[in-house]
């Protein structure tokens, strides 16, 4: 008599419990990994932001080397190119010669860009170099502001001193600051700082900045303790002065002081083109 042995087959695959345990472990690992990835990405954006600011500082240094002075903060009503900002003056030193030449041609047509903004094509020309990657606003030109076909923005503002009335900083109306005139020391004097454009998009214009009372304050320039005349919806903020602090693009009062959207606060360029 032959006895046949029955071979039992072993089950292949996961049980439901094993599958749930594996999913749980993967979820825990992802939960630990994602914040680290996000932190690494934000650190990269912050570093990129600092690199852009260093380029601006280097452009200022090259301009000073060529002209013997720093670029004017902005041009007033008596200038041939009214409301021209320190950024537009630096365009040839930022590898933006074509944009600069276009600006010169448009100023020949209309010496005051606010008389006919549609003529000045640079108003709506977005330059990625001028926008910190951490910012959530300003990357698209505004096309719905009354009287302006298109307006582009900057995260980086020149420091005009304590506030727009004192003109004791590096950049201000028709300024011709020389390095030798910076008495507090080049490494101790901040020249450029950060402030993201506001969501109402009335401040932070890089091409031509009227700002407060035609001083370009809050557009391409701002003081470290800026005052407020209550223009463009800022009347709720009071007269100030406004110093460094946390901000948000949707808060109207955040347009009145330096701040940033990346960890560690706003970054600065000193007058020796050093990034801090």
Regions found by a protein language model. Give the residues of each.
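N-terminal single-pass transmembrane signal-anchor helix
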Residues: 11-45, 55
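N-terminal secretory signal peptides that target proteins for export/translocation
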Residues: 1-9
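Surface-exposed loop/linker segments characteristic of extracytoplasmic
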Residues: 2, 28, 32, 43-276
């Amino acid at each position: 008599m032959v006895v046949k042995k029955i071979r039992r087959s072993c089950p292949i695959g996961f049980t439901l419990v094993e599958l749930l345990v594996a999913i749980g472990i993967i979820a825990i690992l992802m939960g630990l990994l994602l914040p680290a990835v996000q932190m690494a990405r934000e650190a990269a954006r912050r570093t990129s932001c600092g690199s852009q600011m260093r380029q601006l500082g280097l452009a200022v240094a090259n301009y000073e080397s060529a002209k013997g002075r720093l670029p004017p903060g902005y041009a007033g009503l008596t200038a041939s190119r009214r409301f021209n900002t320190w950024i537009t003056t630096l365009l040839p030193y930022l590898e933006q010669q074509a944009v600069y030449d276009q600006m010169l041609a448009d100023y020949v047509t209309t010496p005051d860009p606010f008389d006919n903004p549609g003529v000045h094509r640079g108003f709506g020309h977005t330059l990625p170099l001028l926008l910190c990657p951490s910012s959530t606003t300003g990357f698209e030109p505004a096309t719905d502001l009354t009287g302006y076909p298109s307006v582009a923005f900057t995260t980086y503002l020149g420091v005009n001193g304590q506030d727009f009335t004192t003109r004791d900083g590096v950049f201000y109306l028709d300024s011709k600051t020389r390095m030798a005139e910076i008495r507090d020391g080049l490494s101790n004097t901040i020249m450029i700082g950060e402030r993201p454009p506001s969501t109402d998009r009335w401040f932070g214009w890089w091409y031509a900045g009227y700002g407060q009372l035609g001083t370009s304050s809050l557009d391409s320039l701002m003081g470290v303790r800026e005052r407020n005349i209550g223009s463009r919806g800022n009347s709720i903020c009071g007269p100030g002065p406004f110093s460094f602090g946390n901000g948000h693009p949707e808060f109207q009062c955040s347009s009145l002081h330096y701040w940033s959207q990346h960890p560690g606060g706003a970054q600065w360029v000193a007058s020796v083109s050093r990034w801090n």
